[in-house]
């Protein structure tokens, strides 16, 4: 082994395996494009994006880290979302949660 070398297992790594997912149909009713990053709490995205928000509480886009989805004005699309893991606490974003996700409806 070379110092600093990384040895990985053979095969593909499945992202977000075993996590709860939901899909949401989202329409951009604004006059500007809206881009949402991979780890943004989808419940709190720009208000120009119109969709049923309640089921998205505690979910983010199910896409690779560091990537984003762009919604053009007038565009509607269905996206796949994946549940946050770990402590399941959300802070920041638009400040709509600021704490634990459990026990919220």
From Swiss-Prot:
<dbReference type="InterPro" id="IPR036461">
    <property type="entry name" value="Urease_betasu_sf"/>
</dbReference>
<dbReference type="InterPro" id="IPR002019">
    <property type="entry name" value="Urease_beta-like"/>
</dbReference>
<comment type="similarity">
    <text>Belongs to the urease beta subunit family.</text>
</comment>
<keyword id="KW-0963">Cytoplasm</keyword>
<protein>
    <recommendedName>
        <fullName>Urease subunit beta</fullName>
        <ecNumber>3.5.1.5</ecNumber>
    </recommendedName>
</protein>
<dbReference type="GO" id="GO:0035550">
    <property type="term" value="C:urease complex"/>
</dbReference>
<dbReference type="GO" id="GO:0043419">
    <property type="term" value="P:urea catabolic process"/>
</dbReference>
<comment type="subunit">
    <text>Heterotrimer of UreA (gamma), UreB (beta) and UreC (alpha) subunits. Three heterotrimers associate to form the active enzyme.</text>
</comment>
<dbReference type="Pfam" id="PF00699">
    <property type="entry name" value="Urease_beta"/>
</dbReference>
<keyword id="KW-0378">Hydrolase</keyword>
<dbReference type="InterPro" id="IPR050069">
    <property type="entry name" value="Urease_subunit"/>
</dbReference>
<dbReference type="GO" id="GO:0009039">
    <property type="term" value="F:urease activity"/>
</dbReference>
<comment type="pathway">
    <text>Nitrogen metabolism; urea degradation; CO(2) and NH(3) from urea (urease route): step 1/1.</text>
</comment>
């Amino acid at each position: 082994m070379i110092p600093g070398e990384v040895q990985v297992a053979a095969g593909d790594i499945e992202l977000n395996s075993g996590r709860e997912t939901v899909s949401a149909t989202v329409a951009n009713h604004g006059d500007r494009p809206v881009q949402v990053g991979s780890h943004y709490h989808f419940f709190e995205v720009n208000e120009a994006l119109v969709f049923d928000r309640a089921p998205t509480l505690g979910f983010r886009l199910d896409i690779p880290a560091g990537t984003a989805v762009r919604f053009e004005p007038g565009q509607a699309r269905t996206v796949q979302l994946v549940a946050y893991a770990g402590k399941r606490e959300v802070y920041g974003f638009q400040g709509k949660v600021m704490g634990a996700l459990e026990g919220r409806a």
